[in-house]
């Protein structure tokens, strides 16, 4: 049975601006039917890496937060720390980056909570029912503490997943640093010797005695290592690193399984804005020009159908001249495969459907 995906274009006038139109979209799509009264509501979004300007403006987040508050809910904006070195690898830097990009209580009407804590190791292990690659997903604690979960996604391309949509925002985004490692990595971490200062933090955090300090440097015993990634979170010099070696198909399937861990068993709703569709992730410290014109706003209770509708909407557009999707050979009707030919984005939606998260069949309802 097809799921309903609601769509609003980006036309606006004196009687209704785009924030008001988003509110109407949420109402029409049924978000108001969720019982928000006295509930803690996680609004999951990406605050943007410093230097990137393609992330969603704080005004969009405020519109969603206000909708929740008007119905008695207690919203907060949230994301988890990144696995790689950058402006969001710990909660302090992450908060600074969010504020630098305009996110704060005054601009969004609610507080920001970095879900996996100061060092990215405040996590909950959540069973993945039917998981083939992940049995227990490592999810940021604040995400799982919320009574209601709302995803607010900037839909764009992604260099590893093919595109970054609702499932990517939830599955990868809600993983703790160890959870992100599990998705990206098919092996175990190693220590970059020239960065290691021999402080022993990795040894202290490891429950399996895998890190060994020898000659003032840490070395990881892979026979003891279980690949939990906690050593990555505590290393002050980012010397503990992973091999980014998971296949794109397996990565996408793991993203789907992590998404299932987040959304199972509680009210959820999903919003995706197909605007400023950059070819790469908002995790990058820059953003290339959009690959297609702005399309509009989409909303649904079904995250799989939502992603499918957004993909179809982007692929129906003519690529912008001079963009990464302009010209080239092959994949004429798949802009994401054109710009990232080695990716397999369909595997995420197919696996999500198999897991029962949603369906790729949808009915598009324009408001």
Report the location of each language-model feature:
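Extended, low-polarity segments enriched in aliphatic/aromatic residues
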Residues: 2-60, 66-79, 84-367
